[in-house]
Amino acid sequence: MAKISNIFKEETRKADLHPKRVTHWIHYTKLKDNPAQYRYGKTVQERGELKVEIRRKEEALADLIEADGEVIQDLLVRKIDTDEYEIIAGHHRRNACKILVEERNQENYAMLPCIIRNLSDVRSEFTCYSSNGYAAKTDYEIMCELEGMSHLLRTYPEEFPNLPAG
C-alpha cells in the first residue's frame, strides 16, 4: 500500500557528476575542418590517393543519414571565431550532410546537432585522435594516431593532469 508520507517527502538530490550536454544546431558552412584530422591524408599526395575512397564512404553515410531522417549523433566542436566552429569529431557527418544539401537539394540537413566544448589546441588535437579510436583504420591511420597522441602526452603533460606520470 502506498504511504502518503512518501508523497510529501523532500528528496535530497545528488549533485550531477557529469556536466549537462546541450545540443546546439549549427549550419554546416560554419563548421571548419580540424587541422589535426589525419584521416583525409596529411600531404597533397595522400589526400589525392584517399579522395575517392573517402568520397565513397561519405556518400554511403549520406544515404544512412537520409534513411534515418536525421544525424543521430552530435558532432563535437569548439568555437574558434564569432560564428565559426572547428570540428573535433564528426568530419564525415558534416561532409555527408554537405552532400545531402548541395548535391541532393535536401536543405533539412543543413543544420547539424553539435556539442560545443571549450578545449585548448592540445586537448582538441588529442580528442580528434581519440574520437577516431574505434573506427576501422589503415596502418597509416593507426601510426598517425599513436605518433600524434604520444607527442602531445610527452610535450604537454600539464594538459593531461588525470594521467599517471611515467
Tell where the protein language model's regions lie, with residue ranges.
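Short, charged/polar connector segments at secondary-structure boundaries
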Residues: 1-113
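Amphipathic, charge-rich alpha-helical segments that serve as recognition/docking helices
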Residues: 95-166
